[in-house]
Amino acid sequence: MQSSSPVDTAAAPPLRNRADIADRFKWNLAHIFADWAEWQRAYDALDTKIAAYAALQGTLANGPDRLLAAMKLSDDIGQDTYKVWYFASLKYDEDQRDNQINARRQQVQILFAKATQASAWFNPELLGIPLPTVQQWMTELPDLALYRFALEDLYRQQEHVLDENGEHLLSLSSRFSSSPHDAYAALSTADLRHPSIKLSTGPEVTLTYGQYRAILATNRNQADRAAAFAAYHKMYETNVNTYAALYSGVLQRDWFHSQAREYTSTLEAALHGNNIPTAVVENLIETTKTNTEPLRRYHRLRKRVLGLESYHTYDATIPLVDFDRKYPYEQVLEWLPGSVEPLGSSYQHQLRDVLFGDWIDVYENPGKRSGAYSAPVYGVHPYMLLNYNDTLDAVFTLAHEMGHSMHTLLSNAHQPFVYSAYTIFVAEVPSTLSEALFLDYMLERATDERERIVLLQHAIDGIVGTFYTQVLFADYELQAHRLVEEGRPVTAEMLSEIYFGLMKAYHGDALTYDEQSRVTWARIPHFYSTPYYVYQYATCFASSAQLMRRLTIGSASDRAAAIEKYLTLLKSGGSDHPMPLLQRAGVDLSKPETVRAVVDQLDGLVTRLETAISGLR
């Protein structure tokens, strides 16, 4: 069995020109199109197909054949669009300095808009046909029955659609609906003046967001971290009334749209699209808030290990031990298939196809897009972009994106195009589970206690950041929106008081609280851009924790059944709403025990961390 002790190398790979990187570390986009000439032919053919929408307009009521023709045309255009878009987009991400390729990307975006305009008649015309008529057509024409879920969901979402005049008025409001976020973005980027602080080692640094995060994560001098925290939050404290006015605009906008569409709350309006009951979010918040002891245990352990008299939020990310070994990419390729053994041999085989099929662009090169992602090219296969640098973070990023890619691979193999895409509510479940499986694999094989501690801290920090912090944020959003729903004023003081109260409710006496923590809400971009979004990070984490337990604990027959249910989830794509998809996999997010699976997971990890730390002494 392969040992997981990493090769000890001197440094991460240096930045190389793309031409100097071996082909086996670069994706092969010829799987989509052989060259730009073939791409252009596909682009031109797609343009012609879009024009075919016009011949179908006004004919849907003529019978099931016409509706089926429209659905098939939409699928055909969608599949071709994926290929035309991703070939240009992935090529551009290899070197974003290439203006010629960027122009081609923009060409495709123009074609997107053209397709949207050409098909804008479809939904109103379809919804003019009574649902029982469409259901009868699906009985008469088996090929049309393929689209049952998609068609019936369109009708479901019409429950809160207004008449023509009402929809027109709401469409006019869209012109200013983004104003609070746009103003927030301008205030927080272009207009924000980043302060400078002098570190204990002598140099003066400007506190950009990246520099601020780096100090909190690497600087072992608590006074430096405290100074960075105070100076960074002072920027938001200075403008807190402006941030409050902007956030009030978000809250008022959300409540206006919810009332106009006759929802009982902003939460109900936000969840309606994915057919998520409000009880899911309410259960998530209530269960998490009453199960915070493992989080507090972790804080207290960190305080003791770091030797601090007082423990603050700015002490929460500094490593407990120093450990700087490197994890070469080719070594990790040997470990990944072993890590997914609990998912069965078929899954392992398909994962090797992803790893060794020229689907991954591994290393950074000049001009390459930063970060990492998995691109779902329907009709071809997923592609993965990495900027692998031999660090532990890069290892888990690879495992994370591999989870997404395997989800895409299985969904695309078993679903027609119309159901191949999956919602964010489900999307992060496989990626988070992939990380958890890889963590277990690494921990079982680690021989260095420092490595074990680093791995455990990585896992625990993931739960704190992706679960507890996101639930706190969701709790905050819910309470802030209820201010306007109840007709109460929204002031900076009230918003800060809600946030400060939640910090104390979740972290208890394990933290020493700084007054400037009160304004942390002001700097969270999701609050302004995508309200009621972050809870999904936490529900995905809870789902993966529940699945991890079922896949790795219990009898062989129980684990085999869990594997089958999990693979069915991946193969199901977007063929149903998220809740029933997860329920069929054995996860019911309306039940407290599902959320408590994360709590139990964290509790176990903290216990293992305590043991590993004691092993150093």
Predicted regions and their residues:
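C-terminal, non-catalytic "cap/extension" segments appended to globular domains
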Residues: A19-I21, A30, A34, F122, ...
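Short pre-active-site segment immediately N-terminal to the catalytic Zn-binding motif
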Residues: G379-A399
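Short beta-alpha connecting loops at secondary-structure transitions
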Residues: Y383-N387, H414-I424, I453-G462, H481-L483, ...
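A well-structured
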Residues: M1-D322, L333, G501, A612-R617
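Flexible, glycine/threonine-enriched loop-and-boundary segments that flank and lead into catalytic domains
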Residues: F356-Y373, Y378-M384, K504, G508-S529
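Catalytic Zn2+-binding segment of zinc metalloproteases
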Residues: G403-F417, L437
